[in-house]
């Protein structure tokens, strides 16, 4: 999984911040140990960064991450209904299009947040879940490049950290409540 690669980069290579992605994953995973189906042409990536003293606490990132990622999805799925199923799923038109796996690790007495992101771009799994899955191509007839989505995710996190002085959890929480899947 890309989260495992990120963990290795932090622990073994002492990388502070970064992004990794793969064309496919053989050991992709979701929450509660579920496997993440990894069809080529979709996005499988992880970003990671240290949780510095001036950053929001870890638990707030379970609201922040889906908002940041859903804003990116919304960019590619304009005029589509975007919802969130907390803490880790983004839905378009009532169908799951993205999964997020947030992990906290400690390395050299420092906390690091790893955000694993899977976005269905060109295909989606046939799940036995109560939630149907979809992909960007199916919903919009557009096929954005993986790098295009990844670059926007990175830029969105960079903007979040640059604007940290004006960070207000209440803003994220209110938006999250409005986007919650009923």
Indicate where each model-derived feature is located.
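N-terminal lobe of the biotin/lipoate ligase/transferase fold
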Residues: 1-75, 79
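Long, positively charged amphipathic alpha-helical accessory segments at protein N-termini or as interdomain linkers
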Residues: 53-81, 92-182
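Conserved beta-strand residues within beta-sheet cores
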Residues: 17, 23, 87, 97-101
């Amino acid at each position: 999984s890309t989260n495992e690669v990120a963990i290795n980069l932090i622990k073994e290579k002492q990388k502070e911040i970064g992004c990794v992605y793969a064309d496919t994953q053989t050991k992709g995973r979701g929450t509660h140990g579920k496997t993440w189906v990894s069809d080529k042409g979709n996005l499988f990536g992880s970003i990671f960064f240290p949780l510095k003293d001036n950053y929001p606490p870890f638990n707030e990132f379970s609201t922040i991450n889906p908002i940041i990622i859903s804003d990116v999805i919304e960019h590619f799925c304009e005029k589509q209904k975007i919802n969130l199923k907390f803490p880790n799923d983004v839905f378009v038109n009532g169908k799951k299009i993205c999964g997020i796996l947030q992990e906290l690790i400690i390395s050299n007495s420092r906390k690091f947040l790893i955000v694993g992101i899977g976005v269905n771009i060109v295909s989606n799994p046939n799940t036995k879940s109560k939630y149907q899955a979809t992909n960007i191509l199916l919903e919009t007839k557009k096929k954005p490049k993986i790098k295009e989505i990844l670059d926007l995710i990175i830029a969105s996190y960079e903007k979040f950290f640059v604007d940290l002085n004006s960070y207000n959890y209440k803003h994220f929480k209110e938006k999250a409540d409005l986007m919650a899947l009923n």
